[in-house]
Amino acid sequence: MDLQENLVSDAGDDHMVDIVVEPHSNRDIGIVDEFNIGGDVGFSGDLDLEPRNGIDFDTHEAAYIFYQEYAKSMGFTTSIKNSRRSKKTKDFIDAKFACSRYGVTPESESSGSSSRRSTVKKTDCKASMHVKRRPDGKWIIHEFVKDHNHELLPALAYHFRIQRNVKLAEKNNIDILHAVSERTKKMYVEMSRQSGGYKNIGSLLQTDVSSQVDKGRYLALEEGDSQVLLEYFKRIKKENPKFFYAIDLNEDQRLRNLFWADAKSRDDYLSFNDVVSFDTTYVKFNDKLPLALFIGVNHHSQPMLLGCALVADESMETFVWLIKTWLRAMGGRAPKVILTDQDKFLMSAVSELLPNTRHCFALWHVLEKIPEYFSHVMKRHENFLLKFNKCIFRSWTDDEFDMRWWKMVSQFGLENDEWLLWLHEHRQKWVPTFMSDVFLAGMSTSQRSESVNSFFDKYIHKKITLKEFLRQYGVILQNRYEEESVADFDTCHKQPALKSPSPWEKQMATTYTHTIFKKFQVEVLGVVACHPRKEKEDENMATFRVQDCEKDDDFLVTWSKTKSELCCFCRMFEYKGFLCRHALMILQMCGFASIPPQYILKRWTKDAKSGVLAGEGADQIQTRVQRYNDLCSRATELSEEGCVSEENYNIALRTLVETLKNCVDMNNARNNITESNSQLNNGTHEEENQVMAGVKATKKKTVYRKRKGQQEASQMLESQQSLQPMETISSEAMDMNGYYGPQQNVQGLLNLMEPPHEGYYVDQRTIQGLGQLNSIAPAQDSFFTNQQAMSGMVGQIDFRPPPNFTYTLQEEHLSSAQLPGSSSRQL
């Protein structure tokens, strides 16, 4: 039984897996076609074919193949001069490749006494390429010596002995295309075109290329990994019906791509779908675990995992399938902003599938490439990075950035650098001054270690296997959820310490979550280090230059008088979502005693999560999620039994309607008692205050009067204490006879209905078998009014799949699924 048959046989009864088979006969061939390897197409343009310092490779073998192809294009042969291993790990860390004429011929060989004479005469040529291994595992060109002391013969390169194994060269061509950067690929292809055996290599490439590219057409898992994945997903799906996963098979029924998202990820996305980061870092450096992640941040600025994928490659087809699948899992709701790397296929997929989403590059991803791409410039000019950073971070306007950029390009002779030109062309996606209208929730940082993309960094290493990852996956998520629960509890039950008399600090201490408040508090305290100076002013706008003594820099702040809007050129509000000290300084000058509401983002507040009440503690939240999952599972069982016959169906339906009414009445009674307790407590405090005031007024009267006043105060305090048990009891569940008991006593009630913001419905996945109810008469005060009203409560009869059934998840109504609120509701 192949993988698809296995999946279908296991998934056919509960519709829990999405299997997609899409034949792509030319899959990945585009990588080869892009550079026109083979054929008689000539090359136009002057591309520098020399190896450059800073070019990186996945392995030292790939670096040597690259140098071999360069040698072939120039007309010399190569050899491995030396290599070095680490004393600790025993891994290769250093290698030197040289011209075959490097060094001198030993006297024994020159005299003819050696039985193994060298076929290449040594001339003490110094031409070589020195590569070193970086800590991340990549190999980088450390030093390149170009000049030879002998004649080069490019026209006869094909006759060199080391170049005759064309099939090996062809195989290496494909490996190189996957192993090196885009710029390196183009250089390599040009070398092949100019080599002596160009036409032969091209024809063989077109003949055998499909077998090599085939590596990217399926997920390279170890033996047994597919079954482990399937069993793992089946178990999680059984425990929680809201768990989502989808599988992409190629035309040979082999696993190509895989995506999954847990229930909490899908619920969290309902509240925090403004900014999402899509990270493929692990795909690039880990062949055993090519993991792609969708990541967001919650209201505590903690990373949230919004979906995981294992992918066979980074092709256009893969990215299209993955983004489509992720959108389905998230209810079809696209994010406002998505952060990615600069992959061109990924850019095309985002543009096609997320047309209304702002696509940005992660700033750290751009900046980390600068030392690699421009190491040769940095060796000659020590101030290159300083100039580059000044251009990026100290340009306050678009014109100022362009002026500094082209000045830098001219100063360091980079006018023809393709990657730098490409970066400037897409500057709206990553340069801060061009992103003043984009909120990034603090997710775009200058270093990866500071970003939420480091979600799994401490758990994933280059040699980790899938089985090892799955063993850690649950622990990782549990740790994250516990961190969020602790932060929720602290925010709800602890008061942050105030460090100044600022009214802004007092205002936001009761509004922001603790984490965000502490960050905002730093800005409030920093106001004293700011000195504003008005630059210019007209009837609509005023511009201030704020000197920040702590940061030793000046920042421009604009104030719109007509719109009451602030804009600081440090972009803190746009990047992090709260006002900076420079903007607060101007608010203070304008007489604002509170933060304007447009600068208080709900996503950073205590009540940011739409499905969870702000006053609930961490333990209550965890218990509530468990109850919800348990009810979903039981609802599925009820649906299976209730759809067998009309009689069973009517029994199940009456039970659902009656149970829903009981739960709604119980929640309403609970809320009414809570409000009553609140009013009683308020009245008690008022009477107590009046009594204490009377005690103070009678200080000069007789001792008898003093004692009487004290007795009255004591009686009122006892009255207040007698009300405390009622307040405590009101937090427990209540049965229909008015008895207040713990939640566990009433968990058996089948609260199978899931309340949205308006109306009531049953989770589509749990009640799929109940069928259409347009023929059912109203049961409770027009509870069922029409077919549309019923669509959210029950699904269509489709429990046993008909012939030719396509295995897909019914997700049309998932976007409204969330935990019930506890506000009063009326049927």
Curated annotation (Swiss-Prot):
Residues 103-126 are annotated as: Disordered. A zinc finger (SWIM-type) spans 555-591. It is found in: Nucleus. GO terms for molecular function: DNA-binding transcription factor activity; zinc ion binding. Residues 107-117 have a biased composition (Low complexity). Disruption phenotype: Elongated hypocotyls and reduced expansion of cotyledons under continuous far-red light. Reduced protochlorophyllide levels in darkness and less photobleaching in the light. GO terms for biological process: far-red light signaling pathway; negative regulation of leaf senescence; positive regulation of circadian rhythm; positive regulation of DNA-templated transcription; red or far-red light signaling pathway; response to far red light; response to red or far red light. Its main location: nucleus. Residues 275-371 form the MULE domain. One of its GO terms (cellular component) is nucleus. InterPro entries: FAR1_DNA_bnd_dom, FHY3/FAR1, MULE_transposase_dom, Znf_PMZ, Znf_SWIM. It holds the Pfam family MULE. Induction: Down-regulated after exposure to far-red light. Subject to a negative feedback regulation by PHYA signaling. Residues 65-154 form the FAR1 domain. Keywords: Metal-binding, Nucleus, Zinc, Zinc-finger. Homodimer and heterodimer with FHY3. Transcription activator that recognizes and binds to the DNA consensus sequence 5'-CACGCGC-3'. Activates the expression of FHY1 and FHL involved in light responses. Positive regulator of chlorophyll biosynthesis via the activation of HEMB1 gene expression. PANTHER family: PROTEIN FAR-RED IMPAIRED RESPONSE 1, PROTEIN FAR1-RELATED SEQUENCE 10-RELATED. The FAR1 domain is involved in direct DNA binding, the SWIM-type zinc finger is essential for transcriptional activation activity and both the MULE and SWIM domains are essential for dimerization. Belongs to the FHY3/FAR1 family. This is Protein FAR-RED IMPAIRED RESPONSE 1. It comes from Arabidopsis thaliana (Mouse-ear cress). The gene is FAR1.
